[in-house]
């Protein structure tokens, strides 16, 4: 027979340690998340269906953008009133950078919001886009590095 301490240890659960939110509270939370971000699969689907009701913005450096970027994306490493003057305010902006460890898209989306644009961040950025087989454009295309470096 096992001791009570061993039984308690076996029954402990990190998943169940904190109770789940009530369904309506959880629904509001998840609906809120979807207002701020979109994922690679949703963007791929829309692009494959020809939906162009949004603008894709890459916040990485011009050099990195030239090497590899999502088709149709525009490069805006600096977002301010001057650089977005030609952007249509009636289109949502989908903003990305390298990946989950890069906050360039978060900063870019925030700056776009400050300038009156609606923006969502692409979860996982270019890294997840490429890992999920998304098409890329650029001088190196799929041969481009998968991460940021000091030279680009």
Predicted regions and their residues:
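Flexible, polar/low-complexity N-terminal or interdomain linker segments that lie immediately upstream
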Residues: 1-64, 138-152
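Short, glycine/charged-enriched secondary-structure capping and boundary segments
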Residues: 70-72, 108-111, 135-136
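Short, hinge-like loop/turn segments at secondary-structure boundaries
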Residues: 74, 92, 136-140
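A generic hydrophobic-segment detector
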Residues: 117-152
């Amino acid at each position: 027979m096992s001791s009570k301490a061993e039984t308690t240890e076996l029954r402990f659960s990190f998943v169940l340690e904190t109770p789940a939110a009530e369904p309506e509270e959880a629904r509001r939370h998840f609906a809120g998340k979807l207002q701020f971000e979109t994922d690679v699969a949703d963007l791929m689907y829309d692009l494959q269906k020809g939906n162009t009701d949004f603008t894709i913005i890459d916040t990485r450096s011009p050099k990195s953008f030239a090497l590899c970027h999502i088709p149709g994306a525009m490069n805006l490493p600096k977002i301010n009133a001057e650089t977005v003057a030609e952007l249509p305010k009636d289109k949502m902006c989908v903003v990305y950078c390298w990946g989950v460890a890069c906050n360039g898209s978060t900063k870019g989306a925030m700056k776009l919001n400050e300038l009156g644009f609606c923006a969502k961040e692409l979860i996982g950025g270019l890294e997840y886009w490429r890992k999920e087989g998304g098409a890329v454009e650029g001088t190196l295309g799929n041969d481009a590095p998968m991460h940021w470096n000091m030279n680009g």
